Amino acid sequence: DFLAMHIDGTILKVQLKSRITINKSYIGKEIHMAFPVRGQWCLIPHDVLLEIVSSWQETKAWETKGLYHAKNPNKTTVEALQDYLIS
């Protein structure tokens, strides 16, 4: 959706989403995901997010459509995202 420049000059490819989302087509492409989490924004590499929500890869949606998203991630997921929340 957009490119962001890190303070060190690195360009980040960012997909802006309305909810936490993983997508098979983003794997290995150095894409970052940006989405709201309980009143804050999260910016995280997609492949790191994929590791955090690895159980989602066992869902029918992931297997058939190649994507999965959740409007309200559970407490464990939110805790795992803490290092990626921005203010």
Where are these regions (language model features)?
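Mixed-charge (Asp/Glu-Lys/Arg
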Residues: L3-S87
